[in-house]
Amino acid sequence: MKILQTQNLSKFFDGLKALNRVNIGVEKGSITLVIGPNGSGKTTFINTVSGFYRADEGKVFFEGKDITNKPPHEISRLGIVRTFQIPQPLKKMTVLENLLIAPEGYGERIFHSVSGRWLKEEEEIVEKAFRILEFLKLDHLWDSEAQNLSGGQLKLLEVARAMMKDAKLLIMDEPIAGVNPVLSHSMLERFVELKKMGVSFLIVEHRLDIVLKYTDHIYVMANGSVIAEGKEEDILNNPKVVEVYLGAQDSEIECGV
């Protein structure tokens, strides 16, 4: 069952077609990867799906419902959480505080409760936050200010905030960009555990040498269109994909193949 499906999704900028009838689907409880060279339309695609850009043609369906051109805050309430290449935490707040203000509808009340005045329902949220931090191996940093975290830890904090919102689908723009290989693998292993719990992922990523083995399905984009899709072995053995990545270069593909 597909939790997300686009149908002939197109987007224009100044008369130029940035997305050309794109059909991409994400199975529930899967990790779907979108790859392609710079300028292929990957980021435009996820921005259009998550409501930051308006689609000019086509449809976006989430859990079978048409969500085309809904604003980002409405899409977020449905269980779709978009994370960005550069994390956007509240830097002066601690890791725990960043999680406590994440759930929709609590906001300021939770923030003031950090000083120690907990209501029963707030205690449950704090317990949930600590469970998530432990799962992501961030629990030892709970009282650290976000501005003191490493790049990889900030990426995990974004995931933790999404989990606080009970995300059904995480749309992630280069989640392991700038993250060392050890932490990258650890992060992706956490994603695999989350997908076993029913969470779905739509990921745009360039570091294919690390991410490919964790994915269930891959779409390759070029010039705003999907040119190939399939499993890892299908993509790596597809001459069209090799041609797109190599271009005029007689060197290895970015993924090391």
Swiss-Prot record:
PROSITE patterns named among the record's database cross-references: ABC_TRANSPORTER_1, ABC_TRANSPORTER_2
Keyword ATP-binding: yes
Record-linked CDD domains: ABC_Mj1267_LivG_branched
Keyword Magnesium among UniProt keywords: no
Annotated Gene Ontology cellular component terms: plasma membrane
Binding of ATP, residues: 36-43
Free-text function comment from the UniProt entry: Probable component of a branched-chain amino-acid transport system.
Family: Belongs to the ABC transporter superfamily.
Protein name: Probable branched-chain amino acid transport ATP-binding protein LivG
